[in-house]
Amino acid sequence: MTKPFSVVLASLLAITSTVSPLASAQQSQPLDRIAAIVDEDVVLQSELDRAVRNVKSQYAGRENQLPPDDVLQRQVLERLVLVKLQVSRADGNGIRVSDEELNRAIASIAQQNGTTVDGLRQKLAADGMGYADFRASVRDEIIVQRLRQSFAQSRISVSEGEVDTALAQQAATGSQYHLAHILIGLPEGATAEQIATGQKKVDGVKALIDKGELDFSAAAVRYSDSPNALEGGDLGWRSLDEIPNAFAQLIRDMQPGQVAGPLRGPSGFQLLKLVEMRDANAGGEKKMVTEYHARHILVRIGENQTEAQAKAKIDTIRARIVGGADFQATAKESSEDTNSRGQGGDLGWFPADAFGPDFGKQVESLTDGAVSEPFRTQAGWHIVQRVGSRQTDVSAENQRAQVRETIGRRKLEEEYNRYLQELRGEAYVSYRTGDRADDNATAAPAKSADPAAPSPPPAKPTR
């Protein structure tokens, strides 16, 4: 059996919506320029400058880990291009964000930054950023999240067999691994010359790390083509089921602090660092919950039955049961819940909150065999009979859910990165970092002037 994998993304991309700490205010407001043309959209120089300042603010006190300004600008611009492409694709797929949803998101951002929406406006003004621009940025990032969610729901699935295999593997190793990586990207269908250039660059990066001239995190920020380069290439904690099979065996044999590679993967050359490891089973105590077995009878309220009529009907049904009528037989005859009526109102075993707080409170308050007084929920009027209760260990169930989630996340990361490469390859992108918005000339993005840098990766094609 294959189940769809769904993912909820909880944070906005820092590249465009980070508010705290706020970067220093602009000293002047020059005529805006076009940094890049992206199909029928553009990235303005003001957007690029603001995004670069946001990245620098996140590295306050660690500026030496950032690449030269021209390299950083190119990395950030490429991210903004990808945001524009995703927003455009989402719009074509009918993904929208209402003003009400946007207002709630901004209120949440303000709260996370310890201020109000008005206070947020003031901070943005001090940063030289208009509130309308900020709203547009947040809207774009929510849209990108929803595009990822839609992608996950339509293309990512995890089978029970995959979960079983991962659980067996996890039981055999019992370890989780904190990883970081550096990706030297190669275009799809790379030529021999491009592969050789990529190999030369990754060898150069590895040499810098081995000599101690750069630590791994700084090298990732400076040279990696991965979307998480500006986070030092940090991949977080992974179990073996989240790691591509080609790398899993290698990681098993590594010690914390070791760097492996270069390794050739589908996206290019990789360097992989094992930051630390831990026992995945530590703290894995049982989690016990109370489950209840119950039956119910529902009388709905609608066009053909008023509130008063429904209440009178449920009162009559309860009186019959209290008078000796069998609950199951009465449910088959009178319940308006089509899902459970055929089973005599039987709901099986469930935790108290499975059918909402009102229903749960009624079940919890009963003794086994007792029948509740009529009570109202959004569905209508109910009576419920508690059949039994038990303590259940749900740790195994939770573990399966967690493993399914981690496998799904790994698949989503791999597939969505390929999807982004496809979007980027199909798009018309022209870099115009030196031109005013009303000029027609174009200019390629600046290359690194760092004399110690290995050769840059092959340029991504533009049309």
From Swiss-Prot:
Residues 328-348, 432-463 are annotated as: Disordered. It comes from Xanthomonas euvesicatoria pv. vesicatoria (strain 85-10) (Xanthomonas campestris pv. vesicatoria). InterPro entries: OMP_Chaperone_SurA (IPR050280), PPIase_dom_sf (IPR046357), PPIase_PpiC (IPR000297), PPIase_SurA (IPR023034), SurA_N (IPR015391), Trigger_fact/SurA_dom_sf (IPR027304). One of its GO terms (cellular component) is outer membrane-bounded periplasmic space. GO terms for molecular function: peptide binding; peptidyl-prolyl cis-trans isomerase activity; unfolded protein binding. It is an enzyme of class 5 (isomerase). It catalyses: [protein]-peptidylproline (omega=180) = [protein]-peptidylproline (omega=0). The gene is surA. Keywords: Chaperone, Isomerase, Periplasm, Repeat, Rotamase, Signal. Its EC number is 5.2.1.8. The PPIase activity resides only in the second parvulin domain. The N-terminal region and the C-terminal tail are necessary and sufficient for the chaperone activity of SurA. The PPIase activity is dispensable for SurA to function as a chaperone. The N-terminal region and the C-terminal tail are also required for porin recognition. The lineage of its organism: Bacteria, Pseudomonadati, Pseudomonadota, Gammaproteobacteria, Lysobacterales. Chaperone involved in the correct folding and assembly of outer membrane proteins. Recognizes specific patterns of aromatic residues and the orientation of their side chains, which are found more frequently in integral outer membrane proteins. May act in both early periplasmic and late outer membrane-associated steps of protein maturation. Residues 453-463 have a biased composition (Pro residues). Its main location: periplasm. Residues 1-25 form the signal peptide. PANTHER family: CHAPERONE SURA. This is Chaperone SurA. Residues 174-276, 289-388 form the PpiC domain. One of its GO terms (biological process) is protein stabilization. Residues 440-452 have a biased composition (Low complexity). It is found in: Periplasm. It holds the Pfam family SurA_N.
